[in-house]
Each structure stands twice: as structure tokens, then as C-alpha cells.
From Swiss-Prot:
SUPFAM superfamilies given in the database record: Ribokinase-like
Provenance organism: Streptococcus pyogenes serotype M3 (strain ATCC BAA-595 / MGAS315)
Source species taxonomy: Bacteria, Bacillati, Bacillota, Bacilli, Lactobacillales
GO cellular component, one term: cytosol
Family: Belongs to the carbohydrate kinase PfkB family. LacC subfamily.
InterPro entries, per the entry: LacC, PfkB_dom, Ribokinase-like, Tagatose/fructose_Pkinase
Protein name according to UniProt: Tagatose-6-phosphate kinase
Gene3D superfamilies to which the protein is assigned, alphabetical: 3.40.1190.20
Length: 309
């Protein structure tokens, strides 16, 4: 079983517009609202892929109830209730672009943070892999993911971390290391304090930096150019085909779902990387965030090339 953790979930609202006009009224006909937050995208894709998945995080208010009520029944909902209200995040799709408006989310008390920590420990009993995704809610210290990873490690669970900024830096500088991290080039540049490009030689060098010591997998997203990955002492480039992108929202989360599934099923490197990229691409072909059309899975799987470099 896979446990997905979304500490700062949201209701994701999508507004498609032919044109975004500033300083005037924009009327939207086709509005989509879904339970959101990176970890919830992960759990929906895992569910559609056929994995047994349990979802947790901190939710509150009517917006929190919306999330529970709109997740598929086959996902085991194990959320922790807080006093604040779950946030709303808006994506405006216009002229081939995407503009996002993201609420910060609720402030958690010390008691609520401690309560979730105990809740998390309890949920680990029957899981193999834990995914930790997205931003931390207000009130949580930057090293909170580090704390959860330490607990998971003590219980023999594999962990996939997908976050950025101070939370990611705290984990990299801490003692407890996740099994996998999945930065993109922008996040990698921020971590290292220098601009990174898609140059394989440069990527190979920086992924051997002591900052990443102790992390088994580092999977760097290159967007439409695929992935550059390091597993222990082996490096891979993943070439992906060109596809028509409907919406890239949630594609990185779908990739995390593939990584978690690969770990849970003890797949070899090539199978894990291929599955992860296929699920990310399938999500990009859909309007709905965190959704994949499995009818297209096999065709895309055959088109992906994983090369050791």
C-alpha cells in the first residue's frame, strides 16, 4: 500500500478562457473543481493505475469536507481535521498560457501539528511507500518533512519527497534522507545557487554534490525533454516523445505516482523511470488534474527510451 501525504491540500479550480482581459469582467462557462494539492493528484493517479492507496493530510471547514466527499470511494481517506479552512487554488487557462492564484492556506497550532505527527505514525502500519508532496501549511516548521521522513525511515518505509524551497533545503541538510527527491531544473538551480541547464555532464557533476549524499534516487524533471536521473551511482537520461499537451497541471504529481508505484513493486530502474514518465505524460493529455487515460498507457510506454549515461 502507498500512503500519500498532502499537508496543505486545496480545492483546485480551473477557469478556461479564450482570452484573459485585465481590469474588466471575464465570464467562465466551463468551471472544473477538484480536490487538489500535489499529494491528492498523486493518490488519484495511483488509484486509477490500480494501486491500493491511502490519503492523509490536514483539512478543515466546508472546503475540507469537499475534498473528502469528492475523492473516489476506493481511496482510503485518513485525513486529520484542523480548525482552519482548507484553501482554494485557481488556475486560469488562457491563450495557451496558465496563470495560477494560490491561497496560502490555514495556520496550524502546535497541538494540531503534534496531533498530525501521531496520526502519521499510526497510518504507517500497513504501507510500503510514503509520498510527501507540496508546501507546508503556516505554523509548521521548515524541517517538518524531515521529521516525517525520520519516522518513516525508522519504520522501514520508502519515501518520495516532492517539495521545494526551505522545506527541501531542510531535508537535504538534515540527518534523515528520503528514498527519492524529484526537483525540476528551476528548483535544482535554487538549491545550488547557480543556473542549471539540460547539459548532462553538468547535471551528472552536481548530482554528486555532498548536498545530495544519502539519497538513493534523484530524478530531475526536464519538462518536455524528459528526465535526468541518478540511482545510487548510475545515471540515466529518459527520452520522451512529443505529445499534444492539454494541461500540464499535475503532471509532476503523476510522475511521483509512477515512482511510488515502481518502489512499491520493487521494479528495476528502467521500468520505474518509464512508468513514471508515462503517467506524467498521460496526465498532460487530460483536462482534469490528476487523471490518466490508461487506454493510452501501453503505446506511450513503448515510445520511451531510457539510456544509461
Amino acid at each position: 500500500m502507498i500512503l500519500t501525504v498532502t499537508l496543505n491540500p486545496a480545492i483546485d479550480v480551473s477557469y478556461p478562457l479564450d482570452e484573459l482581459k485585465c481590469d474588466t469582467v471575464n465570464r467562465v462557462v466551463d468551471v472544473t473543481k477538484t480536490p487538489g494539492g500535489k499529494g491528492l493528484n498523486v493518490c488519484r493517479v495511483l488509484n486509477e493505475f490500480g494501486e491500493t492507496v491511502k490519503a492523509t493530510g490536514c483539512i478543515g471547514g466546508e472546503s475540507g469536507d469537499f475534498i473528502i466527499n469528492h475523492l473516489p470511494d476506493s481511496i482510503l481517506s485518513r485525513f486529520y481535521k484542523i480548525s482552519g479552512y482548507t484553501r482554494t487554488c485557481i488556475a486560469i487557462l488562457h491563450e495557451g498560457n496558465q496563470t495560477e492564484i494560490l491561497e496560502k492556506g490555514p495556520m496550524l497550532s502546535v497541538d494540531e501539528i503534534d496531533g498530525f505527527t501521531h496520526h502519521f505514525k499510526y497510518l504507517l502500519n500497513d504501507v510500503d511507500v510514503v509520498t510527501l508532496s507540496g508546501s507546508l501549511p503556516a505554523g509548521m516548521p521548515d524541517d517538518y518533512y524531515q521529521k516525517l521522513i525520520g519516522i518513516a525511515n525508522l519504520n522501514g518505509k520508502k519515501t518520495v519527497l516532492d517539495c521545494s524551497g526551505n522545506a527541501l533545503e531542510a531535508v537535504l541538510k538534515g540527518d534523515s534522507k528520503p528514498t527519492v527527491i524529484k526537483p525540476n531544473l528551476e528548483e535544482l538551480s535554487q538549491l545550488l545557487g547557480k543556473e542549471m541547464t539540460k547539459d548532462f555532464k553538468a547535471l551528472k557533476a552536481v548530482l554528486q554534490d555532498e548536498l545530495f549524499e544519502g539519497i538513493e534516487w534523484i530524478i530531475v524533471s526536464l519538462g518536455a525533454d524528459g528526465v535526468f536521473a541518478k540511482h545510487k551511482d548510475t545515471f540515466y537520461n529518459v527520452d520522451i516523445p512529443k505529445i499534444k499537451i492539454v494541461s500540464a497541471v499535475g503532471s509532476g504529481d503523476s510522475t511521483v505516482a509512477g515512482i511510488a508505484s515502481g518502489l512499491a513493486n520493487d521494479e528495476d530502474d528502467r521500468a520505474l523511470l518509464t512508468k513514471a514518465n508515462v503517467l506524467g505524460m498521460l496526465n498532460a493529455q487530460e483536462k482534469t488534474t490528476g487523471h490518466v487515460n490508461m487506454a493510452n498507457y501501453d503505446k506511450l510506454y513503448q515510445s520511451i527510451k531510457v539510456k544509461e549515461v
